[in-house]
């Protein structure tokens, strides 16, 4: 089968002929229709420090996808051949304390599809049936292929009550932009998103952000005055991993504010903890998606009218994968989709 593999311990990714994956008794075999390129895939493509420590070579990568079930393990119940599915990319152990308590997204033994095991940049993928999610008929393949990052946005955004609240999002990558759309859809008052990338900020405006702020040109505090905000933001969603962005968030949070952190700093990050203490801030770390409550919420949000389609800006056939990675690497894109049909 065709697959995109990290063949060498250097920058790049290669289109190869790989063996079809072998299915177990509790697995599904999925014929891939569309995949999306994630920021994690770009780290692997660029072979950065994290990738060098994490990714075995060779490895078929990718974890954002939609496909069709073409074979079912003999112990699997609840799925049929022909079902359209996406899937949770975190394969959990099922026996640690968190898994047994139903908190599977906090499994300490998580294995990542396309990171620790063969991924979805291929004509076929095998995953445990437990990890598969049936896609409702009224949700398109394009949207289903980005459910993984959309889930990051939904998990982060819905960590705290948003109705009538003022929300600051630092980092206008695709996940931050989708989070802005979620916040507006569920009833936040002002949703302000910050970045220095004008292309991404314009996408955020299209997706419903009240104000998309280029912090290299505008002061966040001036924007707050413009919006009539006198006390600070009630909810912060940190999506960038950039220390200066998080510091700006701490400066502008209201007393009693709540912060959800998805962005991963490049290293240790010093902060002024006195601001956290004296403001009585709550900080929550976010990893992945809640299984499977986040997935049901994703589908319900789209079915209730949330439109995240503007975040998809580029489509390529799999043979043109290099153009897709170039588009993602340019910073002048939203989500990039590769078609395997």
Swiss-Prot record:
InterPro entries listed in its UniProt record: ADH-like_C (IPR013149), ADH-like_N (IPR013154), ADH_Zn_CS (IPR002328), GroES-like_sf (IPR011032), L-Threonine_3-DHase (IPR004627), NAD(P)-bd_dom_sf (IPR036291), PKS_ER (IPR020843), Zn_alcohol_dh (IPR050129)
Example of a GO biological process term: L-threonine catabolic process to glycine
EC number per UniProt: 1.1.1.103
Coiled-coil regions, chain positions: none
Binding residues annotated for Zn(2+) 1, in chain numbering: 38, 63-64
Binding site for Zn(2+) 2: 93, 96, 99, 107
Top EC category: oxidoreductase
Cellular localization per UniProt: Cytoplasm
Manner of cofactor binding, per the entry note: Binds 2 Zn(2+) ions per subunit.
Catalytic activity, as annotated: L-threonine + NAD(+) = (2S)-2-amino-3-oxobutanoate + NADH + H(+)
Key words of the record: Cytoplasm, Metal-binding, NAD, Oxidoreductase, Zinc
SMART domains: PKS_ER
Residues at which NAD(+) binds: 175, 195, 200, 262-264, 286-287
Biological pathway: Amino-acid degradation; L-threonine degradation via oxydo-reductase pathway; glycine from L-threonine: step 1/2
Site features described as Important for catalytic activity for the proton relay mechanism but does not participate directly in the coordination of zinc atom, chain residue numbers: 148
One family name in Pfam for this protein: ADH_N
A GO cellular component annotation in the UniProt record: cytoplasm
Record function comment: Catalyzes the NAD(+)-dependent oxidation of L-threonine to 2-amino-3-ketobutyrate.
Protein name per its UniProtKB record: L-threonine 3-dehydrogenase
């Amino acid at each position: 089968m065709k697959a995109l593999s990290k063949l060498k311990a250097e920058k790049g990714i290669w289109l190869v002929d790989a063996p079809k994956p072998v299915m177990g008794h509790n697995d599904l075999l999925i014929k891939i229709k569309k995949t999306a390129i994630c920021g994690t895939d770009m780290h692997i493509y660029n072979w950065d420090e994290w990738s060098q420590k994490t990714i075995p070579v060779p490895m078929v990568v990718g974890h954002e996808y939609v496909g069709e079930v073409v074979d079912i393990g003999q112990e699997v119940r609840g799925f049929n051949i022909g079902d359209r599915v996406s899937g949770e990319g975190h394969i959990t152990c099922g026996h640690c304390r968190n898994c047994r308590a139903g908190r599977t997204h906090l499994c300490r033994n998580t294995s990542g599809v396309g990171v620790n095991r063969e991924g979805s940049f291929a004509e076929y993928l095998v995953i445990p049936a437990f990890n598969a999610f049936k896609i409702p008929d009224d949700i398109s393949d394009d949207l289903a292929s980005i459910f993984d990052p959309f889930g990051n946005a939904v998990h982060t955004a819905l960590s705290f009550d948003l109705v009538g609240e003022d929300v600051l999002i630092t980092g206008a990558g695709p996940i931050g932009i989708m989070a802005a759309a979620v916040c507006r859809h569920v009833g936040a008052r002002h949703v302000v998103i910050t970045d220095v990338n004008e292309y991404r900020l314009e996408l955020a405006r299209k997706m419903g952000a009240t104000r998309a702020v280029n912090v290299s040109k505008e002061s966040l505090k001036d924007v707050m005055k413009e919006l009539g905000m006198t006390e600070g933001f009630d909810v912060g969603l940190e999506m960038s991993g950039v220390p200066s962005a998080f510091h700006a968030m701490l400066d502008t949070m209201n007393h009693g504010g709540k912060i959800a952190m998805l962005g991963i700093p490049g290293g240790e990050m010093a902060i002024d903890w006195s601001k956290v203490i004296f403001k009585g801030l709550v900080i929550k770390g976010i990893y992945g998606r809640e299984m499977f409550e986040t997935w049901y919420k994703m589908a319900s949000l789209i079915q209730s009218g949330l439109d995240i389609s503007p975040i998809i800006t580029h489509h390529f056939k799999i043979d043109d994968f290099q153009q897709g990675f170039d588009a993602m690497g340019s910073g002048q894109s939203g989500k990039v989709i590769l078609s395997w049909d």
